[in-house]
């Protein structure tokens, strides 16, 4: 007797992601993908920002309120701090590519469930493969543990190089703190004028 096979959301995500020949196609697939409940509670898809030909790619966990409104990753306070991190290595957003493991904001900025993360994982994996960066920077514990398949925390993995196999090549990822965990930059205080 023939068994009826019902595609699970995870199976559908894997098949859809695998079929995307380009970043534009992947974005279109995500816009039409209904296998993750977060899509229905988010304002919009937050796909990526920056240069798709960049040699360095940054990946965080999920969009926040500001990102959900603007449709771009890392645009709020964390975005300003990420911009400073990128500037510290002599680059800016036009020379980097920025995305999240989860492309939709979880309600109330809650932590995505393991199921939501697993459903979205094939899409970010395909996005990494299509961007094909030389260096992948995971921002914070959730993206590090998800993409690098480790249970070690960010305090242990931070600053260490790993290997990430895309299926076609190995990329060098490094884990670092999420910008939200960094202290805010010191307030600018002008020096008192000193007359000679």
What residue ranges belong to the model's regions?
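A polyanion-binding, active-site-adjacent surface
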Residues: 1-196
């Amino acid at each position: 007797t023939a068994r009826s096979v019902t595609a699970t959301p995870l199976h559908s995500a894997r098949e859809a992601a695998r079929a995307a020949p380009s970043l534009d196609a992947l974005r279109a697939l995500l816009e039409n993908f209904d296998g993750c409940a977060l899509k229905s509670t988010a304002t919009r898809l937050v796909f990526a920002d920056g240069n798709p030909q960049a040699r360095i790619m940054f990946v965080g966990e999920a969009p926040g309120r500001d990102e959900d409104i603007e449709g771009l990753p890392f645009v709020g306070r964390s975005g300003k701090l990420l911009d400073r991190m990128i500037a510290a290595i002599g680059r800016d957003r036009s020379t980097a590519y920025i995305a999240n493991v989860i492309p939709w904001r979880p309600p109330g900025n809650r932590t995505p469930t393991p199921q939501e993360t697993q459903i979205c994982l094939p899409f970010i994996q395909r996005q990494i493969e299509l961007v094909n960066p030389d260096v992948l920077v995971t921002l914070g514990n959730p993206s590090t543990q998800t993409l690098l398949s480790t249970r070690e925390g960010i305090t242990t993995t931070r600053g260490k190089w790993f290997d990430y196999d895309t299926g076609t090549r190995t990329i060098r990822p490094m884990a670092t703190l999420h910008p939200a965990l960094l202290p805010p930059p010191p307030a600018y205080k002008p020096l008192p004028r000193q007359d000679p």
